[in-house]
Regions:
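Nucleotide-state-sensitive switch-loop elements of NTP-binding domains
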Residues: 57-82, 87-92, 100, 104, ...
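Histidine-centered metal-binding segments
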Residues: 2-65
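Short, intrinsically disordered, charge-balanced linker/junction segments flanking boundaries
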Residues: 1, 188-189
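The Walker A (P-loop) glycine that initiates the GxxxxGKT/S ATP-binding motif of P-loop NTPases
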Residues: 96
Protein backbone atom coordinates (compact mmCIF):
# COMPACT_ATOMS: atom_id res chain seq x y z
CA UNK A 1 0.00 0.00 0.00
CA UNK A 2 0.99 3.64 -0.40
CA UNK A 3 2.01 4.38 3.20
CA UNK A 4 3.79 1.02 3.40
CA UNK A 5 5.63 1.87 0.21
CA UNK A 6 6.69 5.34 1.25
CA UNK A 7 7.17 4.56 4.95
CA UNK A 8 4.87 7.19 6.37
CA UNK A 9 2.65 5.90 9.11
CA UNK A 10 -0.87 6.87 10.02
CA UNK A 11 0.03 6.59 13.69
CA UNK A 12 2.09 9.78 13.65
CA UNK A 13 0.80 12.79 15.60
CA UNK A 14 0.60 14.94 12.49
CA UNK A 15 2.96 17.63 11.29
CA UNK A 16 4.32 20.41 13.48
CA UNK A 17 4.40 23.77 11.69
CA UNK A 18 6.77 26.17 13.45
CA UNK A 19 8.58 29.43 12.86
CA UNK A 20 12.21 29.54 14.02
CA UNK A 21 12.32 30.22 17.75
CA UNK A 22 8.90 28.69 18.44
CA UNK A 23 8.84 25.77 20.82
CA UNK A 24 7.43 22.43 19.84
CA UNK A 25 5.05 21.10 22.48
CA UNK A 26 3.07 17.93 22.69
CA UNK A 27 -0.29 17.55 24.29
CA UNK A 28 -2.90 14.86 24.54
CA UNK A 29 -6.52 14.99 23.52
CA UNK A 30 -7.55 12.00 25.63
CA UNK A 31 -6.90 8.35 25.23
CA UNK A 32 -6.54 6.85 21.78
CA UNK A 33 -8.79 3.86 21.35
CA UNK A 34 -7.58 1.30 18.85
CA UNK A 35 -10.25 -0.79 17.24
CA UNK A 36 -9.99 -3.38 14.55
CA UNK A 37 -12.12 -6.12 13.10
CA UNK A 38 -11.33 -9.78 13.45
CA UNK A 39 -13.25 -10.50 10.27
CA UNK A 40 -11.15 -12.75 8.11
CA UNK A 41 -8.93 -13.84 11.03
CA UNK A 42 -9.26 -17.58 11.55
CA UNK A 43 -7.65 -19.58 14.33
CA UNK A 44 -7.13 -23.31 13.83
CA UNK A 45 -5.34 -25.96 15.83
CA UNK A 46 -2.27 -27.68 14.42
CA UNK A 47 -3.13 -30.38 11.95
CA UNK A 48 -6.70 -29.19 11.44
CA UNK A 49 -7.51 -29.11 7.77
CA UNK A 50 -9.64 -26.26 6.53
CA UNK A 51 -10.63 -24.36 3.44
CA UNK A 52 -11.55 -20.74 2.99
CA UNK A 53 -13.19 -18.99 0.10
CA UNK A 54 -10.55 -16.49 -1.08
CA UNK A 55 -12.37 -15.29 -4.17
CA UNK A 56 -12.69 -11.73 -2.79
CA UNK A 57 -10.02 -9.04 -3.19
CA UNK A 58 -8.21 -8.20 0.07
CA UNK A 59 -6.56 -5.12 -1.44
CA UNK A 60 -9.72 -3.47 -2.80
CA UNK A 61 -10.45 -1.46 0.39
CA UNK A 62 -6.81 -0.36 0.81
CA UNK A 63 -6.68 0.83 -2.80
CA UNK A 64 -9.91 2.80 -2.38
CA UNK A 65 -8.54 4.53 0.74
CA UNK A 66 -5.28 5.40 -1.06
CA UNK A 67 -7.25 6.83 -3.98
CA UNK A 68 -9.34 8.91 -1.54
CA UNK A 69 -6.17 10.27 0.13
CA UNK A 70 -4.64 11.25 -3.21
CA UNK A 71 -7.93 12.74 -4.47
CA UNK A 72 -8.35 14.80 -1.28
CA UNK A 73 -4.75 16.02 -1.61
CA UNK A 74 -5.42 17.03 -5.25
CA UNK A 75 -8.52 19.02 -4.25
CA UNK A 76 -6.56 20.89 -1.57
CA UNK A 77 -3.62 21.41 -3.96
CA UNK A 78 -6.01 22.98 -6.48
CA UNK A 79 -7.22 25.33 -3.73
CA UNK A 80 -3.61 26.30 -2.97
CA UNK A 81 -2.90 26.85 -6.66
CA UNK A 82 -5.93 29.14 -7.02
CA UNK A 83 -4.83 31.11 -3.97
CA UNK A 84 -1.30 31.49 -5.35
CA UNK A 85 -2.64 32.59 -8.74
CA UNK A 86 -5.02 35.14 -7.20
CA UNK A 87 -2.20 36.69 -5.15
CA UNK A 88 0.41 36.40 -7.94
CA UNK A 89 2.60 34.10 -5.83
CA UNK A 90 5.04 31.94 -7.78
CA UNK A 91 5.48 28.67 -5.86
CA UNK A 92 8.30 26.19 -6.41
CA UNK A 93 8.44 22.70 -4.88
CA UNK A 94 12.09 21.64 -4.49
CA UNK A 95 12.43 17.85 -4.47
CA UNK A 96 15.68 15.89 -4.24
CA UNK A 97 17.37 13.19 -2.20
CA UNK A 98 18.60 13.83 1.36
CA UNK A 99 21.88 15.73 1.53
CA UNK A 100 21.86 16.67 -2.16
CA UNK A 101 22.21 20.41 -1.50
CA UNK A 102 18.63 21.73 -1.70
CA UNK A 103 19.09 24.06 1.27
CA UNK A 104 22.50 25.27 0.07
CA UNK A 105 21.12 26.15 -3.38
CA UNK A 106 18.13 27.83 -1.73
CA UNK A 107 20.39 29.87 0.59
CA UNK A 108 22.49 31.09 -2.33
CA UNK A 109 19.42 31.96 -4.43
CA UNK A 110 17.84 33.88 -1.56
CA UNK A 111 21.06 35.72 -0.70
CA UNK A 112 21.52 36.77 -4.34
CA UNK A 113 17.91 37.82 -5.05
CA UNK A 114 16.25 38.84 -1.76
CA UNK A 115 16.92 42.56 -2.35
CA UNK A 116 15.00 42.39 -5.65
CA UNK A 117 12.18 39.90 -4.96
CA UNK A 118 10.12 39.15 -1.83
CA UNK A 119 10.66 35.51 -0.86
CA UNK A 120 8.94 33.20 1.61
CA UNK A 121 10.10 29.68 2.44
CA UNK A 122 8.48 26.50 3.71
CA UNK A 123 10.97 23.89 4.89
CA UNK A 124 9.95 20.23 5.08
CA UNK A 125 11.85 17.86 7.36
CA UNK A 126 10.94 14.84 9.42
CA UNK A 127 12.43 16.09 12.70
CA UNK A 128 14.71 19.14 12.83
CA UNK A 129 14.50 22.94 12.55
CA UNK A 130 18.01 23.12 11.04
CA UNK A 131 17.03 24.19 7.52
CA UNK A 132 14.50 26.78 8.71
CA UNK A 133 17.13 28.24 11.04
CA UNK A 134 19.55 28.56 8.09
CA UNK A 135 16.92 30.43 6.05
CA UNK A 136 15.92 32.56 9.05
CA UNK A 137 19.57 33.68 9.34
CA UNK A 138 19.07 35.36 5.93
CA UNK A 139 16.09 37.34 7.30
CA UNK A 140 13.66 35.51 5.02
CA UNK A 141 10.20 34.64 6.43
CA UNK A 142 10.22 30.86 6.92
CA UNK A 143 8.23 28.11 8.58
CA UNK A 144 9.33 24.55 9.23
CA UNK A 145 6.97 21.62 8.73
CA UNK A 146 8.17 18.63 10.74
CA UNK A 147 6.39 15.62 9.28
CA UNK A 148 7.45 13.07 11.91
CA UNK A 149 7.32 9.70 10.15
CA UNK A 150 5.93 11.25 6.97
CA UNK A 151 8.36 11.30 4.04
CA UNK A 152 6.66 14.04 2.02
CA UNK A 153 4.73 17.28 2.37
CA UNK A 154 1.02 17.36 1.53
CA UNK A 155 -1.20 20.17 0.31
CA UNK A 156 -2.98 20.67 3.65
CA UNK A 157 0.39 21.11 5.39
CA UNK A 158 1.38 23.74 2.83
CA UNK A 159 -1.98 25.49 3.26
CA UNK A 160 -1.47 25.75 7.04
CA UNK A 161 2.14 26.88 6.63
CA UNK A 162 1.10 29.57 4.12
CA UNK A 163 -1.46 30.92 6.61
CA UNK A 164 1.28 31.11 9.25
CA UNK A 165 3.68 32.89 6.84
CA UNK A 166 1.14 35.58 5.84
CA UNK A 167 2.56 35.72 2.31
CA UNK A 168 2.16 39.03 0.51
CA UNK A 169 1.04 39.45 -3.10
CA UNK A 170 3.60 39.40 -5.93
CA UNK A 171 6.16 37.17 -4.23
CA UNK A 172 7.92 33.83 -4.56
CA UNK A 173 7.25 30.87 -2.28
CA UNK A 174 10.04 28.30 -2.15
CA UNK A 175 8.95 24.95 -0.71
CA UNK A 176 11.79 22.61 0.21
CA UNK A 177 10.19 19.18 0.43
CA UNK A 178 11.37 16.38 2.71
CA UNK A 179 14.56 14.77 1.36
CA UNK A 180 13.13 11.92 -0.70
CA UNK A 181 12.80 11.27 -4.43
CA UNK A 182 9.83 8.90 -4.56
CA UNK A 183 7.16 9.95 -2.07
CA UNK A 184 6.87 13.69 -2.84
CA UNK A 185 6.19 12.92 -6.51
CA UNK A 186 2.77 11.43 -5.61
CA UNK A 187 1.57 14.59 -3.82
CA UNK A 188 0.90 17.88 -5.62
CA UNK A 189 1.15 20.83 -3.24
Amino acid sequence: NMCGTCGCGSESKGPAILKPGEEKHEHSHGEHIHEHSHEGHHHHKEGHSHTHDHSHDHNHKVLAIEQDILKNNQVLAARNSGYFEAKNIFALNLVSSPGSGKTSILERTLADLKAEIPFYVIEGDQQTMNDANRIDALNIPVVQINTGKGCHLESDMVYNAVKKLEIKNDSILMIENVGNLVCPSMFDL
